[in-house]
Regions:
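HotDog/MaoC-like acyl-thioester-processing domains
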Residues: 1-3, 84-132
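Hydrophobic beta-strand-centered segment that forms part of the acyl-chain substrate-binding groove
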Residues: 40-43, 52-96, 105, 122
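Hot-dog-fold acyl-thioester-processing enzymes
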Residues: 1-72
Length: 132
């Protein structure tokens, strides 16, 4: 199984909700316009962890995802390639790498509207039949 999800636009409201709730203090998130990062990036970058959150939601909302998935139980080998920015449209490319009686294993890639890789990781889902 391999699939590509819909795209989600990352908005300034999303950025403020995430950074305010988590109380980010690093200047790239708290004072971007006056930081050295504004010389490197034209737009406000998002915290990388937000992409993991978005990827989980995109995977879950995919209508052909296996119906016997109980829970996402592992994320590993996370590699951030480049930041996502406000107004980017991001989506998930997911590829099933292995299936066992208890688990599904996927490779996830989060990309932007320019098909640039933002994030790669491996995830493991527990199947319903194995929940206690």
């Amino acid at each position: 199984m391999k699939y590509t999800t819909k795209k989600i636009e990352l908005t300034n409201d999303h950025f403020l909700a995430v950074t305010n709730l988590a109380e980010y203090t690093h200047e790239i998130f708290s004072d971007f316009k006056n930081s050295n990062f504004s010389k490197k990036y034209k737009n406000q970058p998002f915290p990388g962890q937000y992409l993991l959150f978005i990827a989980g939601g995109l995977a879950e909302s995919y209508d052909k995802l296996f119906k016997d998935i109980y829970a996402l139980i592992e994320i590993k080998n996370v590699k951030f390639s480049k930041p996502a920015f406000i107004n980017d449209k991001v989506y998930l490319d997911a590829k099933l790498s292995r299936t066992t009686e208890k688990f599904y294993y996927f490779d996830w890639k989060v990309l932007n509207q320019n098909k640039e890789l933002l994030l790669f990781c491996k995830v493991k889902f527990l199947r319903y039949s194995q929940q206690s």
